[in-house]
Amino acid sequence: MPTINQLIANPRKIQKSRNKVPALDACPQKRGVCTRVYTTTPKKPNSALRKVAKVRLTNGFEVIGYIPGEGHNLQEHSVVMIRGGRVKDLPGVRYHILRGVLDTQGVKNRKQRRSKYGAKRPK
């Protein structure tokens, strides 16, 4: 515990919170080009093959984005839009790829929560 005189000499430093999505440059979304599309396994105790893509953004950052939903049409050189939002069981994945935007198709046969997966309203 510092004394009053010590606090007058050097006041307490305000702790800055670190940015959780540095590649977005304070933008809601960013556009980028897929450089690699692959699957990876989550950390314990989960087990799956999660679909992810390495994306080179317009500002030069290279980030890993998660591809949500069942099935996708992404391949190398696909132009995608990313948003912030990490995937808890995939270390290093801090962004989500938006479905139904640019080259990414929406999820087929999606009935509920369609807007999150870029699916049109079924007839």
UniProtKB/Swiss-Prot annotation:
Coiled-coil ranges from the UniProt annotation: none
CDD domains: Ribosomal_S12
Record HAMAP family: Ribosomal_uS12_B (MF_00403_B)
Gene: rpsL
UniProt similarity note: Belongs to the universal ribosomal protein uS12 family.
Modified residues (3-methylthioaspartic acid): D89
Main function: With S4 and S5 plays an important role in translational accuracy. Interacts with and stabilizes bases of the 16S rRNA that are involved in tRNA selection in the A site and with the mRNA backbone. Located at the interface of the 30S and 50S subunits, it traverses the body of the 30S subunit contacting proteins on the other side and probably holding the rRNA structure together. The combined cluster of proteins S8, S12 and S17 appears to hold together the shoulder and platform of the 30S subunit.
Sorted UniProt keywords: Methylation, Ribonucleoprotein, Ribosomal protein, RNA-binding, rRNA-binding, tRNA-binding
GO biological process: translation
Subunit structure: Part of the 30S ribosomal subunit. Contacts proteins S8 and S17. May interact with IF1 in the 30S initiation complex.
GO CC, any one term: small ribosomal subunit
Protein name: Small ribosomal subunit protein uS12
UniProt-recorded Gene Ontology molecular function terms: rRNA binding; structural constituent of ribosome; tRNA binding
